[in-house]
């Protein structure tokens, strides 16, 4: 894009109309582009009972703690949650489970949550178990506007029941649908006011995929940085996928700590 200094006054206006030269953003436009919200509750304003939500994280790593707590305090119910797991009894999505706010869970692993097991066995919650890689691809596909895809994972098991199975090059594949949700809640390391996000280490798990899958995405970040501080090649989720940004402190609880005895030679 050419600088305005290279255009004489009369040509500058014509260049802007033709799209050669962009007009500087107005104050109102800058305000509209600012996606930072004062709290998770403000960012989640408008969510209703029965909403579907994609929640990032893997175990307790990289989970959107602030949004989960806000949802608990808001008391919205009959939620359909898509997430790798359902947290533990007293943390993560387990808080919503204990509060009877989740109607259906689409997940890969639920073994760390005793409350989940109790509700499942009592028929109080609907569960759709999905192979982990398939769940990741369903979220990515939904965010990319792909309605479905074929995978060999799950063929010949309960995963493939009531789903279309086709053969390609002599091998069977099951049709899986992309996942699109009303909302997505994710957690990133750094973000800017335009919603560009950068994740750190293992927290870059299901978060980028969930951010794509949500029609409205709320991202909570540890650090808010100036636009441009995150190099383009380090932006993991472009701001086009994010509608709201919340800054806060996170407990980052360790799900399970294991140690290895020192080996003495």
Model-derived segments and spans:
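Intrinsic disorder
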Residues: 3-6
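Intrinsic structural disorder/low-complexity segments
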Residues: 15-16, 20, 139
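Short, Lys/Arg-enriched N-terminal segments with co-localized hydrophobic residues
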Residues: 20-32
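Conserved alpha/beta enzyme-core scaffold
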Residues: 29-265
